[in-house]
From Swiss-Prot:
Its cofactor is heme b. The gene is MT-CYB. The lineage of its organism: Eukaryota, Metazoa, Chordata, Craniata, Vertebrata. It holds the Pfam family Cytochrome_B. Component of the ubiquinol-cytochrome c reductase complex (complex III or cytochrome b-c1 complex) that is part of the mitochondrial respiratory chain. The b-c1 complex mediates electron transfer from ubiquinol to cytochrome c. Contributes to the generation of a proton gradient across the mitochondrial membrane that is then used for ATP synthesis. Heme b b562 binds at residues 83, 182. The cytochrome bc1 complex contains 11 subunits: 3 respiratory subunits (MT-CYB, CYC1 and UQCRFS1), 2 core proteins (UQCRC1 and UQCRC2) and 6 low-molecular weight proteins (UQCRH/QCR6, UQCRB/QCR7, UQCRQ/QCR8, UQCR10/QCR9, UQCR11/QCR10 and a cleavage product of UQCRFS1). This cytochrome bc1 complex then forms a dimer. CDD domains: cytochrome_b_C, Cytochrome_b_N. It is a multi-pass membrane protein. This is Cytochrome b. The chain crosses the membrane at residues 33-53, 77-98, 113-133, 178-198, 226-246, 288-308, 320-340, 347-367. Keywords: Electron transport, Heme, Iron, Membrane, Metal-binding, Mitochondrion, Mitochondrion inner membrane, Respiratory chain, Transmembrane, Transmembrane helix, Transport, Ubiquinone. Binds 2 heme b groups non-covalently.
Length: 379
């Protein structure tokens, strides 16, 4: 009799995705982040569900309801900080996952990669709306500044912003709709992640060498299930350390001040995970130009398959490209730092140089380095 897991319509899908899936024998720990992102998403949906039971999306009571969750609800403080820091862990895993894809040429799986870029935008939109919900100073002013960027769109900009706000400023209508979207989007993300996996299982996994691994496959279970469990344990260790020892490390102190439209904070900045794009936005003096650069800083990922000029898929055997890749990583750290600094000398010029370098590396230097390496192969 054939095993039930191989014949049952539902279990068959799970079996072919997580148990009998043929996987390359040489994939490293950089391939762990897909499963970690799945764990993060489940954690965020569960903690978010319990927070939504106690949260009220009204400008008069939103801030108080978050305080109530932390003070009066059983383990409410734990759920709230797991959710807030879980978002940070989500983005850390996302950035590492994307970085892995860039380094090892995983973007050559076009459908999987493009769904991944859409997922990145969806997660960023969800995180932005979640940041608004506690209705602290940074929530209110962050929402005001970021939504106001849409007014840079010619002709329809102002109408579009007022339509999103549901009035003439960020107010009750804005908060209510942001809560509604923040609740529904994670389920859309889960569905998109399913499509991401569907496309990915059509082609099979890439591996560090970038070569085809059809001749050397091993079953996902037990080898990579055990390997993934180690990653999950490390994730739990880091997240619980963050939540239990310094839950506000990655937050903004201004968000403990209730939102006040009459008092602007000295430095308005979004969550740390947006700072690199925010720095690029601020480095262009023109509003529309800044918005376009902001969007393109992430959308440029969709161009990666078109910018791939190397004869080799992975960067494993390409030292010049490796140097440029790590320069790009350093540049992103610089942009993240600049995004959190006030707009004054010398931060302005550093941000502008880092922004130019970011686009130069991706659009010009890395493709040129790949062509150079192709010629070096002939020697």
């Amino acid at each position: 009799m054939t095993n039930l897991r191989k014949t049952h319509p539902l279990m068959k899908i799970i079996n072919n995705s997580f148990i009998d899936l043929p996987a390359p024998s040489n994939i490293s720990s950089w391939w762990n982040f897909g499963s970690l992102l799945g764990i993060c998403l489940i954690l965020q949906i569960l903690t978010g569900l319990f927070l939504a039971m106690h949260y009220t999306s009204d400008t008069m009571t939103a801030f108080s309801s978050v305080t109530h969750i932390c003070r009066d609800v059983n383990y409410g403080w734990l759920i709230r900080y797991l959710h807030a820091n879980g978002a940070s862990m989500f983005f850390i895993c996302l950035f590492l996952h994307v970085g892995r894809g860039l380094y090892y040429g995983s973007y050559m799986f076009m459908e999987t990669w493009n769904i991944g870029v859409i997922l990145l935008f969806a997660v960023m939109a969800t995180a932005f709306m979640g940041y608004v919900l506690p209705w602290g100073q940074m929530s209110f002013w962050g929402a005001t500044v970021i939504t106001n960027l849409l007014s840079a769109i010619p002709y329809i900009g102002t109408d579009l912003v007022e339509w999103i706000w549901g009035g003439f400023s960020v107010d009750k209508a804005t908060l209510t709709r942001f809560f509604a979207f923040h609740f529904i989007l994670p389920f859309v993300i889960a569905a998109l992640a399913g499509v991401h996996l569907l496309f990915f299982h059509e082609t099979g996994s890439n591996n560090p060498s970038g070569l085809t691994s059809d001749s050397d496959k091993i079953p996902f279970h037990p080898y990579y299930t055990i390997k993934d469990i180690l990653g999950v344990l490390i994730l739990i260790l880091v997240l619980s350390s963050l939540v239990l020892f310094s839950p506000d490390l990655l937050g903004d102190p201004d968000n403990y001040i209730p939102a006040n439209p009459l008092n602007t904070p000295p430095h308005i900045k979004p969550g740390w995970y947006f700072l690199f794009a925010y720095a690029i936005l601020r480095s262009i003096p023109n509003k529309l130009g800044g918005v376009l650069a902001f969007v393109f800083s992430i959308l440029v990922l969709a161009l990666m398959p078109l910018l791939h000029t190397s004869k080799q898929r992975s960067m494993m055997f390409r030292p010049i490209s490796q140097c440029l890749f790590w320069l790009l990583v350093a540049d992103l750290f610089t942009l993240t730092w600049i995004g959190g600094q006030p707009v004054e000398h010398p931060f302005i010029i550093i941000g502008q140089l880092a922004s130019i370098l970011y686009f130069m590396l991706i659009l010009v230097l890395m493709p040129l380095a790949s062509l150079t390496e192709n010629n070096l192969l002939k020697w």
